[in-house]
């Protein structure tokens, strides 16, 4: 295969390996390195550290600080590790990094009072991408799909401002001479400056180029997966085209710089593999400290020995859609029940209560399922007039529109605008939809299908007995003027709350005909048992009732839990509500910050109080799962979702410049909410705002890989791993850590990963 073809192939591979970023309104947390899960995390970290400067480890200073503050157990480190880390923290050694031609030109030229080339390249491409997504039909050719490369080329050839801004008279001619086809561009670049590059060097270069526009690449990856396009590949070609322009510009105008570029590029091509190996060896010490740090935090968890299950039936059972914030509420609810003389049992269950729904609205489906799944059923949403509140919300969600909104409404409205838009609490939405007919794509769902939904949901919840009252509790959050607010509803829910799913499943489970069919299948729900739906509003910890028949005795327990949490946080419910509705609030809530543990087991075995709010708790009883089938399903669904959430937070801490979204104060929505700029330029940002992981003085999210704990024997875990291919890849390559909880309450390593077939 020729070098040019190899470059095209490798550029295509690098493009396809970019993880998607969902639009703001459909937010789903994503592991940016999801497509690298089959490779060891240490190797991927070293490769991206060299190619793009991306950090998947904290600095030596961080680990040294944790050690000095006794946050890392002495038993987990050696004297050699301590001495080497101290030297690292003092020396501040710089690691080698690939430099694109734009950065090399900036290094070798003196551009006093002029914009740096790399900054202009990123800005120009980014602004062009924004126009492309905002007005796609303007750039379509007759009878053809939109071409990002053609769109950029058309704008660049017509824009004389770049030539003036950069004070380079050759640019117009150079743009005019660029090939019209991205594959031909690759051929030209190969012939001019990449003919001697190895596959390894081409991969490093491609990753370095795409990392300059990683946010846009992630957004286009989402689009490419849903349509027949190659926008990520075209974006990489656009970035490569700028490299070719700067190469030619140096050749025409500055012989010295041109020779320096040749020498520097040649050295990088020749040495890149050795440089990556050097970084991996250098990082090995930090990976040891990272492992010690993670284990030290994990050691704070305390588990009690396996005990006999409570013999009395619960008075109330509350099934929460799993979330680190619901863990706090579950503990408070069970304690409130005890204080009121009521036995309350809480459970954790992922995935919108197992109801794979979509709402059909205005000709399109709005999924109410985790991002990794597809809806199997849908409910048609009836037409509804838009409320004043939603109109105002739309007005003020538009970029830079708050000022025009104040002008239109008058200064008398400024106070109300700064405390939020009037209207229904977002978490109580979709009430009018839940009673609609549940349909499959060939018509209304059959009784058999509806029974199947209920049967699967109940099997996942693993009820051994039914309380008189069972509450399905979804979660959501409400705050204003936050571009990333959908991500705080849930890290995996596409911007949706659990309200609709809870309502629909409760409706089905209370249906007598469905119960009769369930009884025939061996699932006997007592006649006295009633299901209710509710919503945990995570900012105020208030529970919003979605059912109309909830007894006061049940509501009383939930009120007591909310009061308990309000007292514990030292902030009144009113103050929290005010904070969440304030337009200038940078930290309306912490979302899923500090998530670090996923526990499949009996939640009451976890006894440590100081770790509450960091754990995803999903009920699981291995006694009822001898072949590991259910555990494999849990690993393959909530297990992967938790990895995505955890790695988005992790990367927002370790690499906030590339994989975080910067300062929330400066967020500006872009192109129909495809993402945000920080200010008015640079790359589209991805990941979380700095204010979502840092409180101004310290991190509120500890940078830990997900610690998965399973309450099961080794054989059951191995059987599940053999079926959960992607989860097993994450485990084998150390993207997650896996532990087994034994009957004595001890955490044991799962020592024998199976190779997925």
From Swiss-Prot:
Any single GO CC term annotated in Swiss-Prot or TrEMBL for this entry: plasma membrane
Binding site residues for Zn(2+): 321, 323, 475, 490
Membrane topology: Peripheral membrane protein
Disulfide topology: none
Cofactors: Zn(2+)
Location(s), subcellular: Cell inner membrane
Keywords: Cell inner membrane, Cell membrane, Membrane, Metal-binding, Transport, Zinc
Superkingdom assignment: Bacteria
Gene Ontology MF, one: zinc ion binding
Major site of localization recorded for this protein: membrane
Signal peptide: none
Pfam families, A to Z: DabA
Known function: Part of an energy-coupled inorganic carbon pump.
PANTHER family associated with the record: INORGANIC CARBON TRANSPORTER SUBUNIT DABA-RELATED, UPF0753 PROTEIN AQ_863
Record text on subunit structure and interactions: Forms a complex with DabB.
Similarity annotation: Belongs to the inorganic carbon transporter (TC 9.A.2) DabA family.
Designated name of the protein: Probable inorganic carbon transporter subunit DabA
UniProt lineage: Bacteria, Pseudomonadati, Pseudomonadota, Gammaproteobacteria, Alteromonadales
């Amino acid at each position: 295969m020729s070098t040019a073809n190899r470059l095209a192939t490798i550029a295509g591979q690098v493009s396809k390996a970019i993880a998607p970023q969902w639009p703001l309104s459909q937010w789903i947390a994503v592991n940016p390195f999801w497509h690298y899960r089959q490779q060891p995390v240490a190797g991927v970290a070293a490769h991206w550290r060299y190619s793009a400067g991306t950090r998947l480890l904290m600095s030596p200073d961080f680990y040294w600080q944790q050690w000095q503050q006794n946050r890392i157990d002495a038993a987990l480190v050696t004297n050699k590790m301590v001495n080497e880390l101290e030297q690292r923290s003092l020396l501040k050694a710089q690691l080698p990094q690939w430099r694109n031609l734009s950065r090399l030109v900036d290094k070798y030229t003196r551009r006093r009072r002029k914009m740096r080339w790399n900054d202009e390249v990123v800005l120009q491409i980014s602004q062009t991408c924004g126009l492309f997504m905002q007005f796609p039909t303007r750039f379509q050719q007759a009878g053809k799909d939109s071409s990002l490369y053609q769109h950029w080329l058309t704008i660049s050839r017509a824009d004389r401002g770049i030539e003036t801004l950069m004070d380079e008279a050759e640019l117009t001619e150079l743009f005019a001479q660029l090939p019209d086809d991205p594959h031909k561009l690759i051929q030209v670049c190969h012939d001019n400056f990449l003919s001697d590059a190895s596959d390894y060097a081409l991969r490093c270069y491609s990753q370095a180029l795409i990392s300059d526009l990683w946010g846009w690449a992630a957004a286009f990856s989402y689009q490419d997966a849903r349509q027949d396009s190659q926008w990520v590949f075209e974006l990489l070609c656009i970035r490569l085209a700028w490299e070719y322009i700067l190469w030619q510009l140096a050749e025409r105008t500055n012989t010295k710089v041109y020779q320096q570029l040749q020498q520097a590029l040649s050295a990088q091509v020749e040495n890149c593999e050795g440089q990556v190996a050097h970084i991996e060896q250098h990082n090995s010490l930090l990976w040891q400290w990272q492992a010690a740090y993670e284990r030290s935090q994990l050691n704070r968890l305390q588990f009690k020995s396996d005990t006999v299950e409570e013999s009395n039936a619960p008075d109330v059972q509350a099934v929460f859609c799993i979330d680190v914030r619901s863990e706090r509420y579950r503990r408070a609810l069970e304690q409130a029940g005890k204080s009121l003389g009521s036995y309350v049992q809480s459970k954790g269950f992922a995935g919108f209560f197992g109801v794979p729904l979509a709402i059909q609205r205005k000709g399109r489906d709005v999924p109410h399922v985790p991002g990794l799944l597809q809806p199997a059923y849908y409910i048609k949403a009836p037409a509804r007039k838009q409320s004043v509140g939603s109109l105002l919300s739309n007005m003020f969600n538009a970029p830079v529109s708050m000022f025009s909104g104040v002008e239109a409404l008058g200064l008398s409205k400024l106070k109300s605008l700064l405390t939020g838009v009037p209207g229904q609490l977002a978490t109580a939405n979709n009430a009018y939809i839940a009673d609609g007919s549940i349909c499959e794509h060939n018509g209304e769902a059959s009784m058999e299908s509806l029974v199947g939904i209920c049967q699967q949901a109940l099997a996942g919840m693993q009820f051994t007995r039914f309380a008189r009252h069972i509450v399905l509790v979804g979660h959501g959050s409400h705050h204003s003027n936050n571009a990333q607010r959908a991500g705080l509803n849930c890290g995996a829910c596409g911007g949706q709350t659990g309200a609709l799913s809870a309502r629909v499943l409760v409706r089905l489970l209370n249906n007598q005909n469905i119960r009769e069919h369930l009884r025939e299948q061996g699932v006997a729900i007592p006649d006295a048992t009633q299901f209710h739906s509710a919503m945990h509003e995570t900012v105020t910890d208030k529970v919003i009732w979605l059912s109309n028949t909830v007894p006061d005795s049940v509501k009383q327990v939930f009120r007591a839990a909310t009061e308990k949490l309000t007292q514990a946080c030292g902030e009144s419910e009113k103050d929290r509500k005010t904070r969440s509705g304030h337009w200038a609030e940078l930290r309306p809530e912490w979302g899923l910050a500090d998530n670090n543990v996923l526990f499949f087991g009996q939640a009451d075995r976890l006894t440590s109080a100081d770790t509450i709010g960091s754990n995803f708790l999903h009920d699981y009883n291995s006694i009822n799962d001898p072949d590991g089938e259910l555990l494999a399903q849990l690993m393959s669904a909530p297990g992967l979702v938790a990895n995505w959430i955890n790695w988005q937070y992790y990367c927002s801490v370790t690499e906030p410049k590339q994989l975080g979204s910067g300062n929330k104060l400066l967020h500006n929505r872009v192109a129909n909410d495809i993402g945000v700029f920080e200010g008015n330029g640079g790359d589209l940002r991805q990941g979380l705002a700095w204010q979502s992981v840092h409180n101004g003085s310290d991190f509120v999210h500890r940078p830990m890989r997900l610690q998965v704990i399973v309450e099961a024997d080794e054989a059951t875990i191995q059987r599940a791993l053999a079926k959960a291919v992607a989860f097993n890849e994450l485990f084998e390559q150390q993207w997650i850590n896996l532990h087994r909880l034994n009957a004595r309450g001890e955490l044991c390593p799962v020592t024998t990963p199976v190779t997925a077939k």
